[in-house]
């Protein structure tokens, strides 16, 4: 019986994205350490790259950047994964950022490079619109 690695990898990528969003919403450094690989790099909206060495640095910076918008939580809308290899995939997501009262700040798209590192899948690199 042949194992379908594509379905397995797509499911792992989806679990990583869902776990990452839950970690952000819970402001959980420990969970971010599970779902992000460090050093972690993002290509920001202005095209510049930014890297963080720890989950604490990442979360603090994330919250500071979104404070002005009144960010409270993120709602995942769509996850679409393309398998690149048995150790890497590209995952496109769309999501909404919400204020505490549930009103939408905006809808965004991101591309994540999700890799297997030390037998654990996590987001190594991200690029997005917000």
Which positions does each model-derived feature cover?
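Short, cysteine-centered beta-strand-loop-beta hairpins and adjacent loop/turn segments enriched
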Residues: 97-105
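Short, low-complexity N-terminal intrinsically disordered segments enriched in polar/charged residues
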Residues: 1-30, 34, 38, 44
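A short, structured loop/turn motif at beta-sheet edges
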Residues: 81-89, 114-120
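A short hydrophobic beta-strand element
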Residues: 73, 85-95
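A solvent-exposed, acidic/Ser-Thr-rich amphipathic alpha-helical stretch
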Residues: 29-79
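Short beta-strand segments enriched in hydrophobic/aromatic residues
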Residues: 36-37, 95-97, 127-128
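Short beta-strand edge/turn micro-motifs at domain boundaries
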Residues: 106-130
